[in-house]
From Swiss-Prot:
An individual GO BP term: mRNA catabolic process
Organism: Pasteurella multocida (strain Pm70)
Coiled-coil blocks: none
Name the record gives this protein: Exoribonuclease 2
Reactions mediated catalytically: Exonucleolytic cleavage in the 3'- to 5'-direction to yield nucleoside 5'-phosphates
Principal EC category: hydrolase
GO MF annotations in UniProt: exoribonuclease II activity; RNA binding
InterPro entries: CSD, NA-bd_OB-fold, RNase_B_OB_dom, RNase_II, RNase_II/R, RNase_II/R_CS, RNase_II/RNase_R, RNR_Ribonuclease
Family label: Belongs to the RNR ribonuclease family. RNase II subfamily.
Domain RNB: 189-531
Amino acid sequence: MFQNNPLLSQLKQQIRDSKQQVEGIVKGSDKAFGFLECDKKSYFIPPAAMKKVMHGDKIKALIEVVGEKEQAEPDALIEPMLTRFIARVRFNKDKKLQVLVDHPQINQAIGAAQDKSITETLQEGDWVVATLKTHPLRDDRFFFAQIQQFICRAEDELAPWWVTLARHGQSRYPVQGCADYPMIDQHTREDLTALHFITIDAETTLDMDDALYLEPIHQAEEQIGWRLVVAVADPTAYIPLDSQIEQEARQRCFTNYLPGFNIPMLPPELSDERCSLMQDEIRPALVCYIETDLTGNITEKPRFVSAYVQSKAKLAYDHVSDYLENCLDAWQPENPQIAQQIQWLHQFTQARIEWRKQHALLFKEKPDYSFILAENGSVQAIQAQYRRIANQMVEECMILANICAAHYLDEHAKCGIFNTHSGFDKKYLESAHQFLLNQLSDETNQAVLATRYSVANLTTLAGYCQMRHDIELLNSDYLELRLRRFLTFAEFKSEIAPHFGLGLSGYATWTSPIRKYSDMVNHRLIKAVLTQQTCEKPQDDLFVRLQEARRQNRLVERDIADWLYCRYLATQVEQKPTFQAEIQDVMRGGLRVQLLANGAPMFIPASLIHDNKEAIQVNTDTLTLSIQGEVKYKLGDIIQVQLLDVKEETRSIVGTLC
């Protein structure tokens, strides 16, 4: 009687139209209910309604009043949380195939089917890639997924690597090589094999793409400067533009440096052998001559040439640093020529560091954390590694070479792949201005600093560098970390632009063509200038891919590290060890910190900071946490923490204050 009744349908529509409609993101909980997070309000989603949605779904909902409380009734799906996702295989009590999503806030099992292309027999706990096929709000059916790819078995010790690479759509395999690599670049090359080039890398490095030679410049028997010769491996001499290797390199963009092993951008026989600037081997190279005065100022325009070079020594960072620091039983150079190059490079580096300190910006010294792994992938130890003098020697030479390349490309090619950074994000400029005044000004200097840190001044390279130099004098990690939140992201651009992070007017990398596709592109442009050929501007889609690949690689490295940290610290939970930690973030839910001994991330819940949550106030502008009105914790503070719990399934490490 009521079926297909137009009056009833009209009444239902009127009732529906009379209800408030909202859009928001579903937030799950550890209970059956959830919440709909809207711009300015949060609505309760009852358990029955939560069965239609998943944490992270963007939906439209109707707001109903039940008793005296508002609650959300999911109405339409705008954007699902899941499309392609990582999961673990599960079989229910009826032996039906299901998947458990690898996400800390999604715990419901989803029915699944196996794609015919998968040849492995799936077992409980296996890691897989799946896609969501049906969604209750979109398809009027229950959640259902299709397993598209087998990743690895549950017990595979290398799961952190294989799962993370699959999550971000990256290959675990190197690029397929060729049977032979004839040199396609037949242009004339200078013979520079007599110069005493040296390489300085990690002891285990095979893909050596830069070698250095330095000599003093004399006038009337007095030294007036330095002549640095930077030789860079030339893979484009072997790789045709239309080759499969070129296309693979363009897609990968970077060598992926992971804990324990690397996934090279180029075939290993190119990156580790044919192109690598190995000791005593003659190699084609792109070479740059750079002249400076004794204070590090560039005095002549750089000169690029194609050449053949021969590295005379493969040196290791730690050996060279030990030698220069006069460590006990330190390594010694094999001959006077190597010793001379090391000493000259050391002197040159001191001048360049001082030049950058005055005219640009220096990096804040922070350690890198290195995982020491057993053959099966288990973590044996984690070491904090600081940049020593030998690292700085190579770094200063590379930075100088990249400065020269930027201005050379700008002048001669009128294009390139430039590394740029525009400082503060435009939408945060006013906030950065106010923060600086609030933190640094008083009655005596307010007028001066209002001009010094004006929005207009902070948008200029000179004004930004001036501000950073002011901050460095205060030696405040808090100011450094808080201001970092106002910065925009670094970008690749086809035209020269400042790099505020480095404090430079132009920067274009070309010194790592074995490891970076952008450097290969810049090589081709420089070589086009040298051979008087047309310089073709890189296409826009390449810049999009470079940005995405850089972001993906950082996420892959972070996700693997988080997993390994959990495995490493899980064995120590019972001992409840204590650590020094630096506060990295301040949130209403608690503090995020980094353990200084090993770099592990840890979360300190607010409930463990103070037993009365009403006594805790978090200022989201200054990123400080106060207890009963008094600021107790802020970004950059060093605090003592204790390990409480590790949950490998969610890659979370929880601690408390000591």
